[in-house]
């Protein structure tokens, strides 16, 4: 618990989304990004835990994959009426034989990608890999958690809700030396 609390790092906070409150952003869309083998439900247990904990805080949380997204029959304005905040939960683990991991969006048109960051507040939580900002430089609020387990998810929620301050100091350059990741 102590390690999780002291390691989670607020890398980028350009939107001042934090702390989260159900009054400010009651309806959350949760997007899972992972290279892990999925259980039958299709959702990692840590993602399910995050959803459950946020719901206990008073948020209405739904999975992006279960809903509609902007297209010909469902406008961006309609999407914004049912979504106040998008949370990306990334758990892309590297291995000894695969040291470079890049995000590949699940759907053909990249609907789950952060292409609506100028229209909707978006929060990117990176578990297990501190370099995802390279793939999502447009995201304005980005947090590194370094490992994916229940203890870290609990600690993350405490920080998101403002009950625990971010104490982590990145052991690497999460901006990867790129200018656009800092925007």
Model-derived regions: residue spans:
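Preference for extracellular/luminal or secreted protein segments
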Residues: 1-183
